[in-house]
């Protein structure tokens, strides 16, 4: 089997491919993967595990949500990739409900199962739901399947449903090929990530290119793919170079079982055998042979020319802080910790009950550590030496019945304006954070 491409052919390849084919936007991954659901839509939360057939082995899956309110476009899919059969419908009483097909649910679970697979040996195939698989609402009501294996869920009023239990799975084995593909269109997409976390680097949108057409068994090497990626990077970001490969994955004719190529060693990808693709002739309607498709998706780390690679063990850019929490009345030490941080911007108070403050380093209460009933007083001491910055936070007991976010420091009659100003720079109210004692 010959290697269809060689380094000597890159100039011709780029002239023929990149010079004449307009890039098209690539498909952006599994469509059913959602962020946090909107409170305005009814949701089915899928939280199941896999049981390997014939064994006691259990496979964990990340939970995901299905929006039961969105309507699919005609002939299209919902956001979760569910076909139009799984769609909202009106009942006899006029209330909206959603019909979920069993096959669609199993397909969504199958996609979730393989979403985080890192090797070709890690694939499992979903067979069916286990006997304990159940759909319930918040009140514990169980929803049973109809005779056609579908489940109809009400979507008004807005509510959440839970699919729990298990699905039966087995190790994936490719099916035998009976009619081998003749020609395979090889498409390519690549994305880049700055190795230093350089915020000035804005990665380009992932674009898809047609590289070439090969026969089953022809090959592409990792060196050739890296050279193609560097060519694309140089055209868009000439000041950057590739440092290492993060991932290389090949999708075969939209098959969810992809080929995962090694990321830590050189490789040669041989065009995979598969069934010949057919497409209906637009005029006659007769099924005719058409080229199959491989999509090679790669991700690389890059570095700006002249920059040093990131060293995970280099702490020279980090500053040491000692944080002490002290009872304002007894002067007893409540809690002490030492932190290394690259940014003094994070030296601000967080509320343990508010996840939006999770990047901040100081606490306005100590409830999470079992030290109950304390809050900020507004008195904060900030001391420096050659190697350490020591922050002492004085805390007092909050009034009975007040929640953990209550601040004694908000009582203007209790503390002087000078004391409040010392506290204010830690609350990011405008007073700059001093970099050294002389700036105070």
Curated annotation (Swiss-Prot):
Domain of life according to the entry: Bacteria
Keyword Signal on entry: yes
Gene3D superfamilies per record: 3.10.20.150, 3.10.20.180
Lineage: Bacteria, Bacillati, Bacillota, Bacilli, Lactobacillales
Region Disordered, residue ranges: 72-94
Protein name, UniProt field: Streptokinase
Record keywords: Plasminogen activation, Signal, Virulence
Signal peptide stretch: 1-26
GO cellular component labels: extracellular region
Species annotation: Streptococcus pyogenes
């Amino acid at each position: 089997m010959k290697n269809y491409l060689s380094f000597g052919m890159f100039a011709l390849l780029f002239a023929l491919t990149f010079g004449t084919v307009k890039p098209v936007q690539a498909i952006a991954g599994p469509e059913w993967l959602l962020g946090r659901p909107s409170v305005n839509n009814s949701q089915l939360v899928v939280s199941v595990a896999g049981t390997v057939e014939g064994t006691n082995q259990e496979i964990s899956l990340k939970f995901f949500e299905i929006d039961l309110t969105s309507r699919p476009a005609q002939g299209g899919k919902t956001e979760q990739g569910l076909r139009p059969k799984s769609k909202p419908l009106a009942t006899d009483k006029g209330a909206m409900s959603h019909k979920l097909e069993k096959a669609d649910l199993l397909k969504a679970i199958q996609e979730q199962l393989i979403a985080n697979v890192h090797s070709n040996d890690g694939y499992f195939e979903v067979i069916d739901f286990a006997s304990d698989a159940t759909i319930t609402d918040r009140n514990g009501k169980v929803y049973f399947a109809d005779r056609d294996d579908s489940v109809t869920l009400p979507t008004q009023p807005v509510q959440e449903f839970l699919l729990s239990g298990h699905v039966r799975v087995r190790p994936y084995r490719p099916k035998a090929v009976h009619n081998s593909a003749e020609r395979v269109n090889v498409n390519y997409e690549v994305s880049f990530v700055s190795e230093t976390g350089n915020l000035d680097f804005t990665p380009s949108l992932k674009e898809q290119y047609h590289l070439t057409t090969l026969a089953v068994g022809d090959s592409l090497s990792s060196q050739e793919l890296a050279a193609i990626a560097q060519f694309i990077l140089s055209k868009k970001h000439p000041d950057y170079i590739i440092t290492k490969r993060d991932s290389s994955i090949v999708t075969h004719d939209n098959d969810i079982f992809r080929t995962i190529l090694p990321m830590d060693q050189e490789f040669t990808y041989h065009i995979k055998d598969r069934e010949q693709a057919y497409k209906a002739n637009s005029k006659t309607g007769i099924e005719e042979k058409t080229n199959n498709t491989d999509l090679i998706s790669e991700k690389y780390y890059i570095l700006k020319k002249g920059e040093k690679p990131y060293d995970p063990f280099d702490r020279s850019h980090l500053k040491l802080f000692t944080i002490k929490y002290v009872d304002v009345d007894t002067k007893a030490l409540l809690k002490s910790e030492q932190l290394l941080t690259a940014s003094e911007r994070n030296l601000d108070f967080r509320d343990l009950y508010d996840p939006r403050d999770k990047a901040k380093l100081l606490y306005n209460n100590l409830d999470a550590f079992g030290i109950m009933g304390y809050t900020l007083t507004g008195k904060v001491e900030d001391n420096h030496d050659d190697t350490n910055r020591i922050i002492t936070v004085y805390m007092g007991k909050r009034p009975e019945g007040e929640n953990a976010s209550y601040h004694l420091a908000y009582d203007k009659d209790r503390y002087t304006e000078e004391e409040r100003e010392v506290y204010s720079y830690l609350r990011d109210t405008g007073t700059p954070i001093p970099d050294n004692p002389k700036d105070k």
